[in-house]
C-alpha cells in the first residue's frame, strides 16, 4: 500500500513514465514477497501449522493441506500489484472486479467442481484455491494490460494537449 500514494501522485501529475516505473517496482516487490512466502510454506508447512495446533496428527494434516491450499501463492503478487495500481490510477472498480472474480466467481464454483474431478475429495476442496488463484491472475493480467495502457495513453494525450495549449 506504500506505493499507492506515489503512483497516484505521479498519475495526477501526468507523469506516465513514473507511473510505469512505480508499477514495475511494486510488481517486483510483490512477486518477491509472494514467492518468498510460498517457499517458506512449501518448505516448512509444519512450522506454520504448529503455530495453531500441537497434536502431531493435526499438524501433519494441516501441513499437507497448507501445501495444497498455498500451491499457487507464488503468483499472487501479480494480482496484488495490479489491484493496488488500479486503485492508484482511479480504476477502483477494476480492482473490485478482479477481487470478486477470484473469491466468488471462481473459488466458490471450484470448491464444488474440484471434488467431482479428483479422487481425494478433501484435497480437491483445498486445490480449488490455487486453481482459482491461477485463473484469477490470468484474468487480472488481461484486464490490467488493457486498462493500464488505456489509462496511460489518455494521460499522455492530456499532457500533449496541455503542452500545445
Feature map (PLM): residue ranges:
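Membrane-interface helix-loop junctions in multi-pass transport and translocation proteins
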Residues: 45, 104-138, 152
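Short membrane-interface helical motifs at transmembrane helix boundaries
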Residues: 36-59, 63
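Residue-level recognition of transmembrane alpha-helices
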Residues: 30, 66-69, 73, 99-100, ...
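Intrinsic disorder in cytosolic terminal tails and internal cytosolic loops
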Residues: 150-165
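Structural signal for membrane-spanning alpha-helices in multi-pass inner-membrane proteins
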Residues: 41, 84, 110-111, 115, ...
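Small-residue-rich hydrophobic transmembrane alpha-helices
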Residues: 1-45, 76-95
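Alpha-helical transmembrane segments of multi-pass membrane proteins
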Residues: 56-82, 109
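Hydrophobic alpha-helical transmembrane bundles that constitute the permease/transmembrane domains
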Residues: 2, 38-39, 74-81, 100-108, ...
Amino acid at each position: 500500500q506504500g506505493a499507492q500514494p506515489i503512483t497516484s501522485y505521479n498519475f495526477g501529475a501526468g507523469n506516465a513514465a513514473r507511473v510505469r516505473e512505480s508499477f514495475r517496482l511494486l510488481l517486483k516487490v510483490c512477486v518477491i514477497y509472494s514467492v518468498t512466502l510460498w517457499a517458506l510454506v512449501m518448505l516448512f508447512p509444519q512450522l506454520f501449522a504448529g503455530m495453531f495446533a500441537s497434536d502431531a496428527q493435526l499438524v501433519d494434516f494441516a501441513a499437507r493441506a497448507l501445501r495444497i491450499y498455498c500451491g499457487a501463492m507464488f503468483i499472487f503478487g501479480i494480482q496484488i500489484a495490479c489491484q493496488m495500481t488500479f486503485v492508484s490510477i482511479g480504476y477502483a472498480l477494476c480492482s473490485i472486479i478482479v477481487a470478486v472474480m477470484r473469491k466468488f466467481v471462481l473459488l466458490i464454483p471450484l470448491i464444488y467442481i474440484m471434488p467431482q474431478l479428483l479422487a481425494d475429495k478433501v484435497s480437491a476442496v483445498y486445490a480449488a484455491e490455487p486453481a482459482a488463484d491461477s485463473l484469477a491472475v490470468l484474468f487480472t493480467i488481461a484486464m490490467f494490460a488493457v486498462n493500464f495502457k488505456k489509462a496511460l495513453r489518455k494521460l499522455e494525450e492530456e499532457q500533449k494537449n496541455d503542452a500545445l495549449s
